[in-house]
Amino acid sequence: MIQTLTDLSALRALVNGWKREGLRVALVPTMGNLHAGHYSLVMLARQYADRVVSSVFVNPTQFGPNEDFARYPRTPEADLRGLEDAGCDALWLPDVDTMYPLGTALATPIHAPGVSDVLEGECRPGHFDGVCTVVARLFNQVQPDVAAFGKKDYQQLAVIRQMVADLAFPIEILGGSIVREADGLAMSSRNQYLSAEDRPISATIRKVLLQMRDSYAAGTPRAQVEDAASQALEQAGFRVDYAVVRLPDLSEPGDSYTGARVALIAARLGNTRLIDNLEF
């Protein structure tokens, strides 16, 4: 049966007990309102560890002033049931005072230069500083051997990998595959904001990503691929933040480059901001 913890000393006692038994511990950080994508991360983590801790904490420092912190959906009972079914051993539920004992205004910030300054970093200034700051705290609290993050947030995964390498966290970072709805829409806690009229249109993002991959593979210059993607999304009713092709480190590839790439899209449909990507 899953254990629910709200006290940091109790969490550390539990994890230390596991480690004394020689068990590997994994962490799956979340903000709650969980879905099949989150549960797939628990199952992925289980393949690399003997015990899995998931955290649920809606982190105020990664939301901008006009973003949806106050209305971010919170579904604790459903989250607990789903985590238990997925094989999670412990649920860590810190409050804001536990996570930020000196208050958010005095929180020691962490910034990952370069990778956090482009794309999402330009659209949501300070977002990745908040992500790094809370993830580093979760790493210190849980002391995991392994941590799993979803590839839907591709840039976030890259930012965390850079932070882990730079700060020498002894933690293996796993990237979990994107889990999609039947029509291709990437699962997200924010999908429930979509109106009934917008929900069928939202799957256009996946179709455009596939078109970007195929067009790029056919030799179309990158700038043309990106312009065509933005136009297709706008014609479908989206307001586009970006539709780009990048290298895995998020730098820009030359048109003659034939190695691994990723197409990334961020766009708004109605009041809902959606992100997705496709590696190829």
Curated annotation (Swiss-Prot):
Positions bound to (R)-pantoate: 62, 156
Sequence intervals crossing the membrane: none
Keyword Cell membrane: no
Catalytic residues (UniProt): 38 (proton donor)
Annotated InterPro entries: Pantoate_ligase (IPR003721), Pantoate_ligase_C (IPR042176), Rossmann-like_a/b/a_fold (IPR014729)
E.C. designation(s): 6.3.2.1
Binding site for ATP: 31-38, 150-153, 179, 187-190
Catalytic activity: (R)-pantoate + beta-alanine + ATP = (R)-pantothenate + AMP + diphosphate + H(+)
Pathway this chain belongs to: Cofactor biosynthesis; (R)-pantothenate biosynthesis; (R)-pantothenate from (R)-pantoate and beta-alanine: step 1/1
EC category: ligase
GO biological process, one term: pantothenate biosynthetic process
Subunit architecture: Homodimer.
UniProt similarity note: Belongs to the pantothenate synthetase family.
Note from the entry: The reaction proceeds by a bi uni uni bi ping pong mechanism.
Protein name (Swiss-Prot/TrEMBL): Pantothenate synthetase
